[in-house]
Amino acid sequence: MSQSLKSQNTNMSDSGCRDPVGDSQNVLENDPSINSQTQDTRVTPNNTAEAQPLQPTSDLKEDHHEIGARAQEHTDTGDRSESPEEPALEKPPLDKAELESSPSSQDTELGHHPHSEHGGGDALDLDPNCSQSDLGGRADAHLESSSVASPEGAGDRGEADEHLESSSAAPTEGAGDRGEAGQELLAEDSTDGQSLGHSNTGPGNQDSLRRRLPVPEAGSHEEETELVKEKQEVAQDTLRKTDKKSLWTYGSVFLGCLIVAVVLSSVNSYYSSPAQQVPQNPALEAFLAQFGQLKEKFPGQSSFLWQRGRKFLQKHLNASNPSEPATIIFTAAREGKETLKCLSYHVANAYTSSQKVTAVSIDGAERALQDSDTVKLLVDLELSDGFENGHKAAVVHHFESLPAGSTLIFYKYCDHENAAFKDVALVLTVLLEEETLEASVSPREIEEKVRDLLWAKFTNSESPTSYSHMDSDKLSGLWSRISHLVLPVQPVRNIEERGCLL
């Protein structure tokens, strides 16, 4: 092999072509400093390669895949460099020290197989006068010398150097064939060196791979934006529905509380019925003022008398179109005779106080012995004259003393629907046969006492049954018309002793 290379060099010298590789070798041999530096450089990758531990099989597989991918990436670059105007051939020649230090430095830094990236394309500066065959021979000689120059680091160079050496030892039949083989070897060496160099770049190559990853399309980004907007709209709709539900709930609760408050206020005003809340009515205001003063004049009376009497007469005065007159029965025992007469008279006058006139007064005890029909006629005349003349109230004392037949006239004045005067008040008094009347007696018992007394007085089996006489049925009809309110009266000592001061 060496003899063939020497003969090729001799032929190249004879043909007038300059051998840059030989010149660079002569310079290296003559300079001892360069030789020592070359020896140091040769030892360094050996030691580094020996000291470096073997990588795991999985790591080697991953590196192999990465190198394959990156080599495929740079294949296009290598193909483009094979054009006739290849820039690698136009670079200035390199000396032997640079050729030997380039792979050794790469082995030291990267820990991989050295390659002849710089030796393949940068070391040859061909003379344009040389023939194609001379170029092929010089390329083969240069590749063999590069592979032989560092025998100690050949174990680490791997398959790339072996391929190059075997390629350099190819048949040399014909100068044209060797030239084409040399060009193919140069291109292959350049491609392998680029692939190995890129495989050793580490993080930079990973960044380039990341850049080659597919970037999300704008359509997917728009779809994600639309999904986010839809979710936001759904959340806003949920919040609005929640707010509406809360508003309806709170509104219903507030409305219910308002209705309850109005109802309670109405009930309270109905049962309390204070005088100042009553609409303005001159007759009513005058009655309330006079009736309020009676509590001081007649002490010791039950609260039932004042409350029920005031409400009953107030309701009648407040009615715009009353359907019947207001009829009240006051009753007392024998010890309260004067108090009964005086109290009933003041109540009737209080009712008609707005007209500035007194009430009509009839005493049944004075007409007890008279004819029933006569008394009936007289009572009718007095009541009709008084009501027609503006007297809005009448008092009939000792109603139980009137002749039984004469009391039938009160059908006319106390009827529920067909009363002769509906906007008036009739106050009747009944004196019980009992000497005293307990204050603890209930209103119901008082009403029964009065009813029993009238039945005993007005119904008599010996009296004839005629139109002008009283019977049980007629008395029942009369009782239903006059017994709307029965109130007991307790005696007042001053009035019983001194009489009623009208």
UniProtKB/Swiss-Prot annotation:
Q: Which UniProt keywords apply?
A: Endoplasmic reticulum, Glycoprotein, Membrane, Nucleus, Phosphoprotein, Transmembrane, Transmembrane helix
Q: Where is this region: Interaction with TOR1A?
A: 268-502
Q: Where does the protein principally reside?
A: endoplasmic reticulum
Q: Where is the composition biased (Basic and acidic residues)?
A: 59-99, 109-120, 154-165
Q: Which GO terms describe its cellular component?
A: endoplasmic reticulum; endoplasmic reticulum membrane; nuclear envelope
Compositionally biased intervals (Polar residues): 1-14, 23-58, 192-207
Found, by tissue, as follows:
Expressed in the spinal cord and liver (at protein level).
**Membrane topology for this entry?**
Single-pass membrane protein
List the Lumenal topological domains. 268-502
Residue intervals on the Cytoplasmic side: 1-246
In which compartments does the protein localize?
Answer: Endoplasmic reticulum membrane; Nucleus envelope
Sites carrying sugar chains: 318
Tell me the domain of life.
Eukaryota
**Residue stretches spanning the membrane:** 247-267
State any GO BP term from the record. endoplasmic reticulum organization
- Per the record, residues carrying Phosphoserine are 24, 104, 131, 195
Among the GO molecular function terms of this UniProt record, one is: ATPase binding
Q: Which residues carry this modification: Phosphothreonine?
A: 225
Q: Where is this region: Disordered?
A: 1-211
Q: How does it assemble?
A: Interacts with TOR1A and TOR1B (ATP-bound).
Membership in a protein family: Belongs to the TOR1AIP family.
Q: What role is this protein assigned? A: Required for endoplasmic reticulum integrity. Regulates the distribution of TOR1A between the endoplasmic reticulum and the nuclear envelope as well as induces TOR1A, TOR1B and TOR3A ATPase activity.
Name listed for the protein in its UniProt record: Torsin-1A-interacting protein 2
